[in-house]
Amino acid sequence: NVFRWTYASVADFKAKPGMAGVPLLAPWADILDEQAFYANGRRYAFDMELGNVRGARPGHGFLTTVDQWQVTDLRADARSAWVTSTLDVFRDPAWMQQFPFAHRITMTYRLQEGVLEVATAIENLSAEPMPVSIGFHPYVKLTDSTRDEWTISIPAKTHWLLAQTKLPTGETEPIERLFPDPQSAALKDYNLDDVFTDLVRDGQGRAHARITGKAQQLEILIGPNFRGLTVWAPNPSGTGLG
């Protein structure tokens, strides 16, 4: 299993949900600089009393551990297996209070020939344009070696400089300032919570990030609609570049 999963069963996860596997980050993916967001020329302030948005700088949205998903398709054939689920965000008043854009999220997880594909569709059901800033937070690992033996490949040209708050300062630098060789960086030398853009893509518009161990290699393909990549790989010692 290449995913970090600390729960013995689905019941354990429902009893105390947390971040593991491949959670969806929505309706925004990363950290906001205030308890509000802006769209269509307006400021939308969060109601912090509701409890579903937390912190002075809210991060990762508020849908990561919700259980209102409805399975609409579950099948398999000789080569693959897949499950499709739908989340009607407009049905929950507390969600609409925080993000007043009626919409539906449909996700399909498909496993085929050693590849797990996650396809996501968002249907805007509101009368005005809806801001979209979703992401995914895969917790992955290799089993043939330790973190200190891994190398990573980051498919980007630009590294964003962050303040102590982990918010972008607006300054950027070439990725080579952080990784002299972005295609093979020794993870043991880094303590990463870093943002990268100007992704390098293949002919299908996908960017390829990789983690390599002794013999195993895990590749994460980033679809054409995603413009940036955050690498979160904290060093247990708390030391390293990044």
Describe the residue ranges of each PLM region.
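Hydrophobic residues embedded in beta-strands of well-ordered beta-sheets
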Residues: 81-83, 116-118, 207-209, 229
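Active-site/ligand-binding surface loops and adjacent short beta/alpha elements
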Residues: 139-225
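A short, structured loop/turn motif at beta-sheet edges
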Residues: 38-43, 72-83, 110-115, 144, ...
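Extended, loop-rich substrate-binding clefts of extracytoplasmic carbohydrate-active enzymes
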Residues: 49-113
